[in-house]
A protein has these predicted regions:
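A transmembrane-helix-recognition feature enriched in membrane-embedded lipid enzymes
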Residues: 1-62, 114-115
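Soluble catalytic domains of membrane acyltransferases
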Residues: 56, 60-143
Length: 143
């Protein structure tokens, strides 16, 4: 019975709020990076969005080992995509300003693609050697 109620909650409350919060966050990022500090606007709205979505869907998160990350050190973080919440967990709980590497097709998602472009996320295009080379060049410039 609890599972059924949770599914109803997800469908009629969680999902609509997820869409609305995603659009609002994408607009914040897009507008904020255009008129202000890209370092702040390219990360913090997404950070708050990730935390809020996890709370909205009642997903408990426990982070271990974050204290082992050195403040001025660069890292590569890899999500295994074994669940549908890893993006929210990384954004909401990693507490590191970072850049995503994502399929270039995601650029076509309304609002989200715009926000990713404005916040200089790295779009991976594997449609040929020249596109792959350009992806590496873009990544080098952004990072």
């Amino acid at each position: 019975m609890i599972t059924l109620l949770y599914r109803i909650y997800q469908l009629f409350i969680g999902l609509p709020l997820l869409v609305i919060l995603t659009i609002i966050t994408a607009l914040e990022v897009g507008i904020g990076t255009t008129i202000g500090n890209g370092h702040f606007w390219g990360y913090y709205p997404g950070h708050w969005w990730g935390k809020l979505i996890l709370k909205l869907f009642l997903i408990p998160v426990k982070v271990e080992g974050r204290e082992n990350l050195e403040k001025d050190q660069s890292y590569v973080f890899v999500a295994n995509h074994q669940g549908s919440f890893d993006i929210f967990i990384i954004y909401g709980h990693l507490n590191r300003n970072f850049k995503w590497m994502m399929k270039h097709q995601l650029r076509k998602i309304p609002f989200v693609g715009y926000a990713c472009e404005k916040s200089h996320q790295i779009m991976v295009d594997k449609r040929g050697p020249s596109k792959i080379r350009k992806t590496y060049e873009d990544a080098r410039e952004i990072l």
